[in-house]
């Protein structure tokens, strides 16, 4: 399906509300519907990465099946690691070993993808595009998902960042 250059896809955050988004993104992939511009914040940024790499089912699998298997959200993690989410599992083990992320497909995608974070120094939203450095992609999506008080501050390019949904929960930029 052809989408004009003025149309974009906005992926909001909202934690487990992102499960619905997973189904929508799988539908879009099933019908080869692509947008020239996609922007995601928090859970939307995570799910959007699977959409951009065209890994159908990956976002749903990580949000439902792997949650059930690994219990990566909860007070246990907050008390043990000062993080309600097991970020090491989510952003290292999953994409590298358990549920491999296709960075090359993402980097080769002609569509633009932007992830939103909250800059802790300015209190404003920062909008990041990264299509070359996989470590920076992980830094950005980790920052976009770092909830205040229950997740540690993340750093992108040495700048402290938190969840993009704090200041721009439905990014229409």
Give the role of each language-model region.
Residues 1-41, 49-173:
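Patatin-like phospholipase
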């Amino acid at each position: 399906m052809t989408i004009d250059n003025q149309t974009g896809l906005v992926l909001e955050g909202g934690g487990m509300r992102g499960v619905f988004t997973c189904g929508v993104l799988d539908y879009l992939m099933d019908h080869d519907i692509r947008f020239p511009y996609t922007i995601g914040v928090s859970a939307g940024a995570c799910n959007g990465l699977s959409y951009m790499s065209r890994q159908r089912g990956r976002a749903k699998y990580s949000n439902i099946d792997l949650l059930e298997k690994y219990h990566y959200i909860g007070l246990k993690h907050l008390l043990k690691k000062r993080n309600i989410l097991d970020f090491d599992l989510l952003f290292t083990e999953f994409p590298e070993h358990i549920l491999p992320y296709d960075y090359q497909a993402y980097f080769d995608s002609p569509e633009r993808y932007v992830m939103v974070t909250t800059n802790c120094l300015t209190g404003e939203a920062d909008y990041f595009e990264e299509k070359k450095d996989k470590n920076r992609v992980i830094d950005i999506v980790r920052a976009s998902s770092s909830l205040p008080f229950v997740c540690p501050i993340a750093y992108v390019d040495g700048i402290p960042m938190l969840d993009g949904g704090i200041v721009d929960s439905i990014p229409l930029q």
